[in-house]
Amino acid sequence: MNRRGFLNQTAGLGLAALGAPNFARAAGTPNFVIIFLDDSGWADFKPFGHPNYPTSNVDRLASEGCRFNNFYVPQAVCSASRSALLSGCYPGRTKVFGAHGPRARGLDPSFATMGQVLQAKGYRTAVFGKWHIGDQPETRPPARGFDESCGLMYSNDMWEFHPQNPQAYSKFPLQFWENGKVKIERVTPEHQPMLTTWYTEHAVDFIQRNKSNPFLLYVPHSMPHVPLFRSEKFKGKSGAGVYGDVMMEIDWSVSEIMKALKESGLEENTLVVMTSDNGPWTSYGNHAGMTPFREAKGTGFDGGTRSACIMRYPGKIKAGSASTQAFSTIDLLPTFAQLAGAPLPANPIDGKSVWDLIVDKPGAVNPHDYYAFCTGPNFEAVMSGDGHWKLHVPHTYRTLVESGNNGKPGKFRQASIELSLFDMDKDPFETINVIDKYPEVAARLKMYAAQHRKQFFD
């Protein structure tokens, strides 16, 4: 099927010496809002194909902005994906792989974050939600460029009620933090239903208090990662089970954030990005999202690495549009820096500004030769910068053999793939190996794969 139819602290910054002054908004200085879901499937929302969940506010966001059908993450696992977003670096560069547990160091402070880049330019910065890129004093939000913060330091399933490893996770209580201090020492099943509400209330309050200051607001929701929880006001309201209720509450959160921007007179000058850290955790069956693509979270296939993405910026991004341009979370930091007039970090990064692609500038081409994908510390695939071709190097991967149900996981088995080339325009599901048909394309991507492996994995 045709793709187009199918569908350190400030030490790392060049301007570190400027600190983070408050200043009146300069003309044209945009705000940035990132709504980052956890394990949401590409097809979880109506603009991307799901007809059943009542998510009218996400639908409206898409109708007022652009739906990006080919948006990628470099690794389809929590910590690696979030570190890539905030640092603009591949996991191979930062060595942040997989999902970190309690007290992990996470993203080394030598890598500047998006918060630090914009904070040094005078932006107010906040993160309300799941952090998961460091759980030590020097790697928690206050030390990483965020003026305000609240939420969990890691996934909401890393607690004493884990369905498979309760003894391991019970050694460390799941804590709720606020501005560098523990607010709730032990998160319980009574607290979890309030997470989406708490994150949203903090986000709305932050917007209302920063009408005159440019800001970065990062809202990495804990949902719809298992275990699923929703507040009383959404229980049974979707008509589509617990997962539908959770998505309905996230839709409400989007509405509250957009309403706060409008009432504060900021919606015309704010770039809103909504996406997910990776594809769905399909082993959880009816407690997981959906993707039409091959495999899911925890693999280098598009079911894991392709995330639904919506962007809204009135007057800049065409309302009601859809794009098949390919780009990645690593590109958001340099893109935001360009729009804010902020210097890039002093440390090397891998992302590049893709603003011309986002606004569909005539003749714009992707600045990357390729994008790379890994799972854990294992390099697995490269894709041409335009998203047309994808080459998998030989590797093993997990594939679902038995789906779980009602919060209990199913079973995986190990599978393997040989050296394989896929034409993503004609075969977005990665089913037909065309490596013998296009030897020149394969040779070019093999060269990029060898370069990436040598630089980051050998």
Task: Describe the predicted segments one by one.
Residues 2-420, 426-458:
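Formylglycine-dependent sulfatase
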